[in-house]
From Swiss-Prot:
It comes from Schizosaccharomyces pombe (strain 972 / ATCC 24843) (Fission yeast). The active site is at 156. This is Pseudouridylate synthase C18B11.02c. It comes from the Eukaryota. Signal peptide: none annotated. One of its GO terms (biological process) is tRNA pseudouridine synthesis. One of its GO terms (molecular function) is RNA binding. The lineage of its organism: Eukaryota, Fungi, Dikarya, Ascomycota, Taphrinomycotina. Pseudouridine synthase that catalyzes pseudouridylation of RNAs. Its EC number is 5.4.99.-. PROSITE patterns: PSI_RLU.
Length: 394
């Protein structure tokens, strides 16, 4: 029986810092290895690569196959090789990882079973897509000399704050039970557009449905999964509010979508506070059809970086000409027009550190046995400092 070979997860792991707020990984060669999927059976090797892996320009995979960079069952394949059940397909590629924030992964607590961290915004948790070494898991393994870790809770790449990792599958299962327990209390802070109600707790019980998985788009929908969040305003600075968020369920993008639905989206959220996608209402009360929202979001994703392009118009004093110049500059930041001299891959420009996160932070997790908390991020403290009536966060 064919087996996928083991690999050193930190092979070629090297970090470069230039003092510009970014952590970089120099390009390196990497062997992508996978078992054939059921939907691949009976298709040619070239057909599989052209339909399943679209991160390369047209013609790249045919050239890679003809150059011997693609193997089937450890044998060099050709464009007409038919994929069958049990086949192992590999691709030797020059890998270019996107830069991430250079902020360190803070250790909140560590014992023989768990590591509790303060995750920086803009860093994915585990290898996915174009990210491999520029992930929380590999950073912990490389810089903190941690052995193999198992994530126990999930934070989006753009979100910062508390995360739990176990050091064994057994400990991971024990923590998983904690995480789904209704006795577990979670607290987040978010900085949102506008003056959030100051009338005590605001509860949102709107159900959530993933309407476009490839775009990461979730919306309020009657056929969605049950979701419940308790919100409370902490401070208001005249433009934005700092809101304490207590999720009672754990749905994808729950806090981001509930805040948008209430009319107070996270101020720099590239999806749910984007006027080009949602229009002037920014999706309040679920306004906008799925079809129109998906179409606009898809178009923006093809031409622009995942950044809150228009969100600051309510917050800055820039002229219309300055705003247009800023937008035009962003339009060219996705691809530079240059190519790697070694592999021909189109090169992306670097994001600014501000584009690597949103104003959403996992602040505190508490069970009957333990309690862990991080410091408030600077963007949250900034709001509190501007409001003399800001409430304390216990």
């Amino acid at each position: 029986m064919l087996k996928r070979p083991k690999r050193d997860p930190l092979k070629d792991c090297e970090y470069v810092f230039k003092g510009d707020g970014l952590r970089r990984v120099p390009p390196y060669y990497y062997e992508y290895i996978t078992f054939a999927k059921l939907r691949w059976y009976g298709k040619t090797l070239l057909e599989v690569f052209n339909t399943e892996f679209r991160d390369r320009e047209s013609g790249y995979y045919e050239k890679a196959i003809r150059n011997g960079q693609v193997k089937v069952n450890n044998q060099i394949g050709n464009v007409d090789t038919l994929i069958e059940n049990g086949y192992i397909v590999s691709h030797h590629a020059h890998r270019h990882e996107p830069p991430v924030s250079d902020q360190p992964v803070g250790i909140v607590h560590e014992d023989e079973s768990y590591v509790v961290i303060d995750k920086p915004a803009g860093v994915p948790v585990h290898p996915t897509g174009r990210y491999n070494h520029n992930t929380v898991l590999h950073i912990l393994m490389k810089e903190n000399k941690c052995s193999l870790l198992y994530p126990c809770n999930r934070l989006d790449r753009l979100t910062s704050g508390l995360m739990f990792f176990s050091k064994s599958p057994k400990a991971a299962e024990e923590m998983r039970v904690h995480m789904i327990s209704k006795s577990l209390k979670k607290e987040y802070v978010a900085r949102v557009i506008g003056e959030f109600p100051n009338s005590g707790e605001v509860i949102c019980d709107a159900p959530l449905l993933t309407v476009a998985p490839t775009l990461g788009l979730n919306r309020i929908h009657p056929d969605g999964k049950e979701a419940s969040t308790v919100f409370k305003r902490i401070a208001f600075d005249g433009h934005t509010s700092l809101v304490l968020c207590k999720p009672l369920t754990g749905r994808t993008h729950q806090l981001r979508v509930h805040l948008q639905y209430l009319g107070y989206p996270i101020a720099n959220d590239p999806i749910y506070a984007n006027k080009r996608v949602w229009g002037p209402s920014l999706g309040k009360n679920g306004e906008g059809s799925n079809e129109s929202v998906i179409m606009r979001l898809s178009e923006i994703g093809k031409t622009e970086t995942a950044s809150p392009l228009l969100q600051y118009e309510w917050y800055t004093n820039e002229t219309e000409a300055e705003a247009k110049a800023r937008r035009d500059k962003r339009l060219g930041e996705l691809l530079t027009g240059k190519h790697c001299s070694e592999c021909g891959t189109p090169l992306y420009s670097d994001p600014s550190p501000e584009e690597l996160g949103i104003w959403l932070h996992a602040l505190k997790y508490e069970s009957k046995d333990w309690s862990y908390k991080t410091q408030l991020p600077k963007w949250a403290l900034d709001v509190c400092c501007r409001d003399p009536n800001a409430l304390p966060i216990e």
